[in-house]
């Protein structure tokens, strides 16, 4: 009898019980803290990088926003970049920032930009674990209509001197509004291509 009980106990110890613990169910069912990391899929934005090597001063970033992400006409774009980008000698050429109608695969007409401002060391608030961000504000001469796809282009970027995983966030501001609306995040592996 004891042998049979011992066999049953050792079998259950080897096989184990396939019941999730309370901690496991909290991780998978919770909308709160994501221990693994990453941006929720509904906030992920598409992008394309060209000349994506370390220290390359001819890098080109195309960052797409689908029309269904923006439900009001937009007059200002706010792009935030973690300060690690500039700490590792990355530079964005402010004179080579463009905004186009359309998606990356089919760029349309360029949208005229009124002014581009750079503000470094801005507290991020939410959506990013870094406290220090660099902010680029793009003021448009004409509004981007609601539900219209557009692409932000950073041309002649000087990539950092090391590979970085960067969460580049986008907020938009409709004309006449005071509060910006978070649209999404481009999770970009910068200066990684060999």
Regions found by a protein language model. Name each.
Residues 1-7:
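Bacterial N-terminal signal peptides that target proteins for export
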Residues 11-20:
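C-terminal segment of classical bacterial N-terminal signal peptides
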Residues 22-128, 160, 164-167:
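N-terminal secretory signal peptides
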Residues 64-66, 80, 137-139, 153, ...:
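Generic structural detector for well-ordered beta-strands
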Residues 66-68, 82, 141, 155-157, ...:
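Solvent-exposed residues in well-ordered beta-strands and their adjoining turns
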Residues 130-138:
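Strand-loop-strand motifs at the edges of beta-sheets in extracellular beta-sandwich domains
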Residues 137-161:
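Low-complexity, intrinsically disordered segments enriched in Ser/Thr together with acidic residues
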Residues 156-194:
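Helix-rich interaction surfaces within compact, conserved domain-sized segments
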């Amino acid at each position: 009898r004891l042998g049979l009980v011992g066999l049953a106990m050792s079998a259950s110890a080897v096989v184990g019980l396939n019941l999730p613990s309370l901690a496991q169910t909290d991780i998978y069912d919770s909308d709160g803290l994501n221990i693994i990391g990453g941006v929720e899929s509904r906030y992920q934005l598409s992008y394309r990088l060209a000349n994506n090597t370390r220290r390359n001063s001819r890098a080109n970033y195309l960052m797409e926003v689908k029309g269904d992400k923006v439900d009001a006409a937009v007059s200002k774009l706010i792009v935030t970049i973690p300060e690690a980008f500039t700490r590792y000698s990355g530079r964005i050429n402010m004179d080579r920032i463009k905004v186009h109608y359309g998606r990356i695969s089919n760029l349309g007409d360029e949208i005229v930009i009124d002014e581009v401002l750079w503000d470094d060391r801005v507290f991020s608030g939410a959506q990013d674990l870094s406290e220090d961000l660099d902010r680029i504000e793009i003021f448009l001469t004409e509004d981007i209509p609601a539900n219209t796809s557009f692409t932000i282009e950073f041309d002649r970027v000087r990539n950092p001197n090391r590979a970085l995983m960067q969460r580049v966030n986008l907020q938009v501001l409709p004309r006449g509004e005071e509060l910006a609306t978070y649209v999404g995040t481009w999770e970009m592996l910068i200066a990684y291509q060999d």
